[in-house]
């Protein structure tokens, strides 16, 4: 029986040895307990609330390159989703009192009350990513000072799967680089 208990303690000790090492409280030179997590709390930043608006998926990233957009388009088409382009003027892109359709007591941040204009029709049956990229270029050329986003729909589930910006107007002042998003 003692052997069994010994074996169990060895097993438990091996399991404890596999667990990651977390910062432990240690005594500093003044005799007070200190913890590395306290230092991390001091390094926390405050989110910059001004001119720091986001749009859907990938908004926290810098603007996507053409190559990155192409990879996203390939992923959309590989899943048999339908891509669609939408655009909106700078002053109409965000939810607000001026650009929302009110149908009763609805909050101004309710997303379904704000519509972007569709660029042509959804690209039903599209299998070539270059077609989508050429439509993005055509829309950007036609509306250079508008926000343009690519959304995709799943016909089976009948829902929007994803949406992300593919063009931000050069005059937009609402975007901050990731390093400038906190103070």
Curated annotation (Swiss-Prot):
Transmembrane segments: none annotated. Gene3D superfamilies: Ribulose bisphosphate carboxylase, small subunit. One of its GO terms (molecular function) is ribulose-bisphosphate carboxylase activity. GO terms for biological process: photorespiration; reductive pentose-phosphate cycle. Pfam families: RuBisCO_small (PF00101). Its main location: plastid. Residues 1-43 form a transit peptide. It comes from the Eukaryota. It is found in: Plastid, Chloroplast. Keywords: Calvin cycle, Carbon dioxide fixation, Chloroplast, Lyase, Monooxygenase, Oxidoreductase, Photorespiration, Photosynthesis, Plastid, Transit peptide. One of its GO terms (cellular component) is chloroplast. Belongs to the RuBisCO small chain family. Heterohexadecamer of 8 large and 8 small subunits. PANTHER family: RIBULOSE BISPHOSPHATE CARBOXYLASE SMALL CHAIN 1, CHLOROPLASTIC, RIBULOSE BISPHOSPHATE CARBOXYLASE SMALL SUBUNIT, CHLOROPLASTIC 1. RuBisCO catalyzes two reactions: the carboxylation of D-ribulose 1,5-bisphosphate, the primary event in carbon dioxide fixation, as well as the oxidative fragmentation of the pentose substrate. Both reactions occur simultaneously and in competition at the same active site. Although the small subunit is not catalytic it is essential for maximal activity. The basic functional RuBisCO is composed of a large chain homodimer in a 'head-to-tail' conformation. In form I RuBisCO this homodimer is arranged in a barrel-like tetramer with the small subunits forming a tetrameric 'cap' on each end of the 'barrel'. This is Ribulose bisphosphate carboxylase small subunit, chloroplastic 3. It comes from Acetabularia peniculus (Green alga).
């Amino acid at each position: 029986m003692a052997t069994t208990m010994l074996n169990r303690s060895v097993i438990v000790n091996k399991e404890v040895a596999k667990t990651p090492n977390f910062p432990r409280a240690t005594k500093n030179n003044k005799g007070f307990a200190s913890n590395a997590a306290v230092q991390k709390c001091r390094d926390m930043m405050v989110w910059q609330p001004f001119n720091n608006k986001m749009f859907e998926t990938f908004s926290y990233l810098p603007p996507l390159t053409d190559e990155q957009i192409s990879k996203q388009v390939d992923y959309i088409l590989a899943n048999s989703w339908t891509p669609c382009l939408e655009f909106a003027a700078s002053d109409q892109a965000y939810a607000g009192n001026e650009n929302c359709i009110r149908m009763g007591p609805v909050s101004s941040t309710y997303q379904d009350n704000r519509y972007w204009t569709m660029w042509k029709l959804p690209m039903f049956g599209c299998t070539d990513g270059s077609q989508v990229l050429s439509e993005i270029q055509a829309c950007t050329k036609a509306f250079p000072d508008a926000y343009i986003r690519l959304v995709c729909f799943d016909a089976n589930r009948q829902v929007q799967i994803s949406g992300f910006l593919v063009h931000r107007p050069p005059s937009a002042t609402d975007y901050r680089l990731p390093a400038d998003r906190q103070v």
